[in-house]
């Protein structure tokens, strides 16, 4: 998956289209990412859950994962870009680059 934890992304589709946020967690097996402040849902928790160390019962607002196809990584110039790879000559490792300007991400 080309989007990693810590990346700044722009939501390009869905109810939060146009929102920017930081990737809090990536789920490569499910092709989803958790973005800060995006796709917020209300989760109803039972009062009995308090015995297991959770918060008191009620309605909790939290982020839900969003599909990776609905986000684009924001490059160093602050514009959304697609991601490509190149091989670093010194370390022989893959490095992510911006397809828009060719710079490393």
Curated annotation (Swiss-Prot):
Q: Recorded GO terms, molecular function?
A: rRNA binding; structural constituent of ribosome
User: GO terms for CC?
Assistant: ribonucleoprotein complex; ribosome
InterPro entries xref list: KOW, Rib_uL2_dom2, Ribosomal_uL24, Ribosomal_uL24_CS, Ribosomal_uL24_KOW, Translation_prot_SH3-like_sf
Asked whether the UniProt record includes Ribonucleoprotein among its keywords, one would answer yes
- Provide the GO biological process annotations: translation
Q: Which keywords accompany this UniProt record?
A: Ribonucleoprotein, Ribosomal protein, RNA-binding, rRNA-binding
PANTHER family the record matches: MITOCHONDRIAL RIBOSOMAL PROTEIN L24 (PTHR12903)
This chain's function reads: One of two assembly initiator proteins, it binds directly to the 5'-end of the 23S rRNA, where it nucleates assembly of the 50S subunit. One of the proteins that surrounds the polypeptide exit tunnel on the outside of the subunit.
Q: Which family is annotated?
A: Belongs to the universal ribosomal protein uL24 family.
* Assembly notes: Part of the 50S ribosomal subunit.
Q: What is this protein called?
A: Large ribosomal subunit protein uL24
Q: Which organism is it from?
A: Mycobacterium leprae (strain TN)
The coding gene here is rplX
């Amino acid at each position: 998956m080309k989007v990693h934890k810590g990346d700044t992304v722009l939501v390009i589709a869905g109810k939060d289209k146009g929102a920017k946020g930081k990737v809090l967690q990536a789920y490569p097996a499910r092709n989803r990412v958790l973005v800060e402040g995006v796709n917020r849902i209300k989760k109803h928790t039972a009062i009995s859950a308090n015995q297991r160390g959770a918060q008191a019962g009620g309605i909790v607002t939290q982020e839900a994962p969003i599909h990776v196809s609905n986000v684009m990584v924001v490059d160093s110039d602050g514009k959304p870009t697609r991601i490509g790879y190149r091989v670093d000559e010194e370390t022989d490792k893959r490095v992510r680059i911006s397809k828009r300007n060719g710079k490393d991400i």
